[in-house]
């Protein structure tokens, strides 16, 4: 009489490798989905513009210095949906911010 023995080792090592690879891919994709949090922990503006025409700007976000970045960042959202970093020390950018703040306070 033959007895069937169950073994803990898989009979197909290639199947095991494929399963482990799939598991690693799933884990990596989940980590990548949370990667946007990491980008918030550093300066967003590596290069800045000295100015941009006010008619092209939809909104402006001024980020104060903090643990994420030691400098003030001015990020303009343009009407075409793109974002542009502006130099907060530029006189033109300071005028843009002033006009947008005055426009918002009169409404």
Curated annotation (Swiss-Prot):
Localization per record: Secreted
Signal peptide: 1-34
Predominant location category: secreted
SMART domains cross-referenced by the UniProt entry: SCY (SM00199)
Processing and modification events after translation: N-terminal processed form GRO-gamma(5-73) is produced by proteolytic cleavage after secretion from peripheral blood monocytes.
Its job: Ligand for CXCR2. Has chemotactic activity for neutrophils. May play a role in inflammation and exert its effects on endothelial cells in an autocrine fashion. In vitro, the processed form GRO-gamma(5-73) shows a fivefold higher chemotactic activity for neutrophilic granulocytes.
Gene Ontology CC terms, in alphabetical order: extracellular region; extracellular space
Protein keywords: Chemotaxis, Cytokine, Disulfide bond, Inflammatory response, Secreted, Signal
Family that this chain belongs to: Belongs to the intercrine alpha (chemokine CxC) family.
One GO molecular-function entry: chemokine activity
InterPro entries attached to this UniProt entry: Chemokine_b/g/d, Chemokine_CXC, Chemokine_CXC_CS, Chemokine_IL8-like_dom, CXC_Chemokine_domain, Interleukin_8-like_sf
Gene Ontology biological process: immune response; inflammatory response; neutrophil chemotaxis
Disulfide links within the chain: 43-69, 45-85
PANTHER family recorded: C-X-C MOTIF CHEMOKINE 3, SMALL INDUCIBLE CYTOKINE A
Protein's recorded name: C-X-C motif chemokine 3
């Amino acid at each position: 009489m033959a007895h069937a023995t169950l073994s803990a080792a898989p009979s197909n090592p290639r199947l095991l490798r494929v399963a482990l690879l799939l598991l690693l891919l799933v884990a990596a994709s989940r980590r990548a989905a949370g990667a946007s949090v990491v980008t918030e922990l550093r300066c967003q503006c590596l290069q800045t513009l000295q100015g941009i025409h006010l008619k092209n700007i939809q909104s402006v976000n001024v980020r104060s210095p903090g643990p994420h970045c030691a400098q003030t960042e001015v990020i303009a959202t343009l009407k075409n949906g793109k974002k542009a970093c502006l130099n907060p020390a530029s006189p033109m950018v300071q005028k843009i911010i002033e006009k947008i703040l005055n426009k918002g306070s009169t409404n």
